């Protein structure tokens, strides 16, 4: 079984990208954190650690595709220095490639839109694993951690979709609109399947996916694809394409649910240095934990950011 990795990445500090974002986004959109706040685009080198972790802990990956917008992470010298005996091939894929035939929706600054199109990468294997650039592998993994004989592994738990929707209704609105949360996009996916009675509450882990699912589903439902990618910034009406695949495959008995407990190191870096120190000390005791998500490292203090990056480098075994 050939398995590829797909990483969606943007260097939001690139002046050209900043100008492009400002040209298409209103002041309200650009200052709404869950839609287009600056931390959604800012980079502190996460892509290097994500790619390095794949080489260290999943050398069986066939190829790494980095999906981006007219940018290049410049990984060659970093990989040559840290993996002198060879590394997994890396190819950068521009948004124009996966949006071919849908150019009217570019440029896009919307991770949901982009993730709805990654299956269109030319040459992508049937089995692929999707990463955000704030994810790393934190221990050795095998293909069986992601795929079964006839389907996929999903690190999630079932939640009653009606209760989740009710909870959302009781929460505050912000900036005159409903806040767009991870759960909200999952609920929208469930609605596509005739108001599915539950969602699979995914965690911040890599997502194992089948290319043919999207190819077939969107061939049968082309308008659904158009509606999900037409928004340049995140929109309350969008659905999570990964959740859609998992719900449908689960109905068919082709999606195996596994607990994320003891398998995920999650750190929300906005918190204090004391919190970060305690979290990293705890993480160090979990040697077999497979996945790491370091959310919004750019929001940590300078010292907190350094602690996180030093810990990641040590975990992966990188040179200074």
Predicted regions and their residues:
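Long, charge-rich alpha-helical interaction segments
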Residues: 153-236
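Short, acidic, metal-binding catalytic loop of nucleotide-sugar glycosyltransferases
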Residues: 53-61
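Short catalytic/ligand-binding loop motif for oxyanion handling, primarily in non-cytosolic enzymes
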Residues: 13-17, 63, 72-77, 100-101, ...
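A glycosyltransferase accessory/donor-loop signature
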Residues: 200-320
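Short loop/turn segments at strand-loop or loop-helix junctions that form parts
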Residues: 4-13, 18-19, 95
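Active-site-proximal specificity loops/subdomain of glycosyltransferases
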Residues: 33-38, 42, 74-124
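A solvent-exposed, charged loop/short amphipathic helix patch at secondary-structure junctions
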Residues: 12-40, 155
């Amino acid at each position: 079984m050939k398995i590829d990795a797909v990483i969606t990445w943007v260097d939001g500090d690139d002046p050209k990208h900043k100008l492009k974002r400002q040209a298409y986004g209103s002041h309200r959109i650009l200052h709404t954190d869950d839609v287009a706040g600056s931390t959604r685009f800012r980079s502190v080198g996460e892509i290097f650690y994500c790619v390095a972790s794949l080489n260290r802990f999943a050398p069986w990956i066939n190829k790494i595709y980095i999906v981006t917008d007219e940018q290049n992470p410049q990984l060659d010298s970093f990989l040559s220095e840290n993996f002198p005996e060879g590394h997994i091939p890396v190819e950068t894929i521009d948004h124009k490639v996966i949006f071919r035939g849908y150019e009217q929706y570019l440029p896009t600054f919307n991770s949901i839109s982009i993730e709805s199109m990654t299956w269109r990468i030319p040459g992508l294997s049937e089995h692929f694993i999707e990463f955000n650039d704030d994810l790393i592998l934190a221990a050795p993994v095998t293909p069986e951690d992601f795929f079964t004989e006839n389907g996929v592994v999903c690190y999630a738990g079932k939640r009653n979709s009606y209760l989740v929707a009710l909870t959302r209704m009781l929460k505050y609105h912000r900036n005159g609109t409903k806040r767009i949360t991870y759960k909200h996009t999952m609920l929208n996916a469930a609605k596509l399947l005739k108001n599915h009675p539950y969602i699979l509450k995914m965690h911040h882990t890599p997502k194992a996916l089948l290319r043919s699912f999207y190819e077939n589903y969107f061939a049968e439902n082309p308008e659904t694809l158009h509606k999900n990618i037409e928004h340049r910034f995140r929109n309350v009406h969008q659905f999570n394409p990964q959740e859609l695949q998992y719900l449908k495959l689960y109905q068919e008995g082709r999606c195996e649910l596994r607990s994320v407990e003891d398998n995920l190191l999650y750190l929300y870096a906005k918190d204090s240095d004391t919190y970060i120190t305690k979290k990293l000390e705890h993480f160090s005791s979990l040697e077999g934990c497979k996945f790491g998500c370091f959310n919004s490292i750019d929001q940590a203090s300078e010292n907190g950011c350094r602690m996180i990056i030093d810990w990641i480098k040590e975990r992966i075994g990188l040179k200074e």
